[in-house]
Amino acid sequence: MGDILGAVYDLGHRPYLARRTVYEDRLILSTHGNVCRAINLLTHDNRTTLVYHNNTKRIRFRGLLCAYRVPYCGFRALCRVMLCSLPRLCDIPINGSRDFVADPTRLDSSVNELLVSNGLVTHYDRVHNVPIHTDGFEVVDFTTVFRGPGNFLLPNATNFPRSTTTDQVYMVCLVNTVNCVLRFESELVVWVHSGLYAGDVLDVDNNVIQAPDGVDDND
């Protein structure tokens, strides 16, 4: 379910609406100490061919890193969290974290150069120190912005008569221990044309949530 946050207008068109959807997920890291999860960022409105003009997608990830390993309570684990995306179509197969880094057994491993040369963008990459017990956690909280349908990086004022491909966004985790659990919430804000939604519109601070390209926030 999503909340309609507000609306802005561009000349000659109906208003755009900001729709927010919150996802929750849990990643249980395998005994190999690394995991990769593809994240589908499309909201219900995006699954139609009627998506109009550019979309600006502002995503806030708030995760709780929890590590559990009996009987070693009181120790801490290191967990590297990465959020990556492919801003254009890429036919390179991705089968897990080992495809994102050169050596998935090392927390300081470099990012796969082949993916980088094919347009891989790293939006977040940080190592967290996580307590190993049931009550402790480390907070991961960051915001990033994607532009255009399918995360394609396109110039301003480019119009799209229909939707394109789904987003290729991946959460990658590398840890130096086993039985770690990553719980996270992701808040997605996407602008859609008002022709896709006929419900109530709430006020929103448009200086916080960026409008689509070519749309005047002050209108």
From Swiss-Prot:
It is found in: Host cytoplasm; Host nucleus. A motif (Nuclear localization signal) lies at residues 57-62. Keywords: Activator, Host cytoplasm, Host nucleus. GO terms for cellular component: host cell cytoplasm; host cell nucleus. Its main location: host cell. Pfam families: Benyvirus_P25. Residues 103-146 are annotated as: Transcription activation. The keyword Transit peptide does not apply. InterPro entries: BNYVV_p25/p26. A motif (Nuclear export signal) lies at residues 169-178. Homooligomer. Pathogenicity factor implicated in symptom exacerbation. Might function as transcription activator (Potential). Belongs to the benyvirus P25 protein family. This is Protein P25. It comes from Beet necrotic yellow vein virus (isolate Japan/S) (BNYVV).
